[in-house]
Amino acid sequence: MAEEEIAALVIDNGSGMCKAGFAGDDAPRAVFPSIVGRPRHQGVMVGMGQKDSYVGDEAQSKRGILTLKYPIEHGIVTNWDDMEKIWHHTFYNELRVAPEEHPVLLTEAPLNPKANREKMTQIMFETFNTPAMYVAIQAVLSLYASGRTTGIVMDSGDGVTHTVPIYEGYALPHAILRLDLAGRDLTDYLMKILTERGYSFTTTAEREIVRDIKEKPCYVALDFEQEMATAASSSSLEKSYELPDGQVITIGNERFRCPEALFQPSFLGMESCGIHETTFNSIMKCDVDIRKDLYANTVLSGGTTMYPGIADRMQKEITALAPSTMKIKIIAPPERKYSVWIGGSILASLSTFQQMWISKQEYDESGPSIVHRKCF
């Protein structure tokens, strides 16, 4: 236990899930939904110990009586009071540590507004009294986790998708592209197409059921048109799914129509490019000399890249866009759901990284803006 006393804490705050644990571990100890729930009704049972807010799994399990809010939208914190509740819950209930005893590594979305990283820094030092902290860019950590320092990361989570070209460990900000299309949009889309089939999902609680459907039977078709034809002519692609109340629903072409929206955002009424084209555009914004390295090191990361078939489809689509002689390699590590966290765990335990931490003393001398000088 002795060495854990000083272990750094690594917290990857995603729009959908918060991943937290100790640097040096190979997986996060705690993974829970980034949600804060407040009761919809007045409590009637006296002495029940009802709280005015619930966080994470507890909010999830009581979702029927709560209104659920996500403090992180599109990868960026929009509600700081709720965010503080999530961090408090992470330290005291999930990891059971005293934050004033451990350095904390937090993650941020690429192109996160400057004011946001300052606010994170301020809360860590002033509310939680951490001895040291650091803010790292999510996609860069995913690349470290795959054992590379150069490549392009297509990171797609619950709230946002980014394509981030990285050369020798540095993200190239001019070529980072953001796509506001991710897991949550796919959940909403699946709700819509299931409603068209006559199943009704409307409340925030029912949306969580649809999220589960999205994660279990869905996959990415290699050839969408052909798959649609197969689904129309036979029932070979149908799968049944049991709802919490025992009702069984059958889903057919929804299985691949849902994630297809990643490649064809027009399905959601969006005019943006699909993930394959966004990745290609990101590469094209980079210096011509490094493109070859990016094509050969295209790393997928985040929960929304967990669909079976997604790597083959990316390979096919990017091959069609790139010069014909180009070697294209899509890397889809099996643990990519947590690769941001794993990269953070690796980074925070490197001996060379120890001088990179922002200390409480530096913060007291310079204020929150220190984060821009020390974390890049």
Curated annotation (Swiss-Prot):
Disulfide bond among keywords: no
Post-translational modification: Oxidation of Met-45 and Met-48 by MICALs (mical1, mical2 or mical3) to form methionine sulfoxide promotes actin filament depolymerization. Mical1 and mical2 produce the (R)-S-oxide form. The (R)-S-oxide form is reverted by msrb1 and msrb2, which promote actin repolymerization.
This protein's UniProt keywords: ATP-binding, Cytoplasm, Cytoskeleton, Hydrolase, Nucleotide-binding, Oxidation
Record's subcellular location: Cytoplasm, Cytoskeleton
EC number: 3.6.4.-
Primary enzyme class: hydrolase
Gene Ontology cellular-component terms listed: actin cytoskeleton; actin filament; axon; cytoplasm; membrane; NuA4 histone acetyltransferase complex; synapse
UniProt keyword annotation of Cytoplasm present: yes
Major subcellular site: cytoplasm
Domain of life of the native organism: Eukaryota
Reaction(s) the record says it catalyses: ATP + H2O = ADP + phosphate + H(+)
Record-linked SMART domains: ACTIN
Alphabetized GO MF terms: ATP binding; hydrolase activity; protein kinase binding; structural constituent of postsynaptic actin cytoskeleton
Gene3D superfamilies assigned: 3.30.420.40, Actin, Chain A, domain 4
Sequence positions bearing Methionine (R)-sulfoxide: M45, M48
Pfam families membership: Actin
UniProt record, GO biological process: axonogenesis; cell motility
Family: Belongs to the actin family.
Physiological role: Actins are highly conserved proteins that are involved in various types of cell motility and are ubiquitously expressed in all eukaryotic cells.
Known partners and oligomeric status: Polymerization of globular actin (G-actin) leads to a structural filament (F-actin) in the form of a two-stranded helix. Each actin can bind to 4 others.
Protein name per its UniProtKB record: Actin, cytoplasmic type 8
